[in-house]
Amino acid sequence: MKWFCANEEHVFWQEITNNISYMITEGYDHQIIIGTDSQRIGNEAVVVVALCIVSDMPDYERVFFYSKEKRPKFTDLYSRISYETQKSIEIADLLKERTTATLENLNISIHLDVSSNEAKNKTSKYSSSLISLVKAYDYPHVQVKPNSWAASYIADKFTKNDR
């Protein structure tokens, strides 16, 4: 996967994981938030994973990175949101593998682009099963709309640009 920072410059995955490892080793307070969104464009779907870091480490207080892929369009809503959820879990798992941290030290939160409000969103009927899925992968911190800003705002923004 190719990663970019907020100004759309390329950044290497190893640089991201090295900085996270350093932040944890040095004892900086932090939270890592991962969210994924997708957008249908013609016969394709653009899928964006946002990796956000909130920390008290200088120059890393509030940063985010994103990765984008194109794939065939999804055939239905559940396929789309379950794929987005799996992508977020995949990145969280990669962080566990590639950093010196334990799961407790990583402090990961997964943001899902689903709603718990039945009146407002078609995705609400899937929210409890997707939350359970994330928790089954040992990620207990899960947010849904309106609190899932990493997916609903940051990843969403980059599904619409041309990079």
Regions from the language model: what does each represent?
Residues M1-R40, E104:
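Basic, amphipathic N-terminal segments that precede the first structured/catalytic domain
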Residues I33-T36, S109-S115:
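Short glycine-rich or small-residue beta-strand-to-loop segments that form or flank ligand, phosphate
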Residues I34-G35, Q39-F64:
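Acidic, metal-ligating active-site segments
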Residues N43-V47, A119-S127, Y153-D156:
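A short acidic (Asp/Glu
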Residues K70-L106:
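Acidic helix/loop or adjacent segment enriched in Glu/Asp that either coordinates divalent metal
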Residues T75, A136, K160:
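Catalytic phosphate/metal-binding cores of nucleic-acid and nucleotide-processing enzymes, i.e., regions
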Residues L112-N147:
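Short, low-complexity, polybasic intrinsically disordered segments
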Residues Q143-R163:
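C-terminal functional segments of enzyme domains
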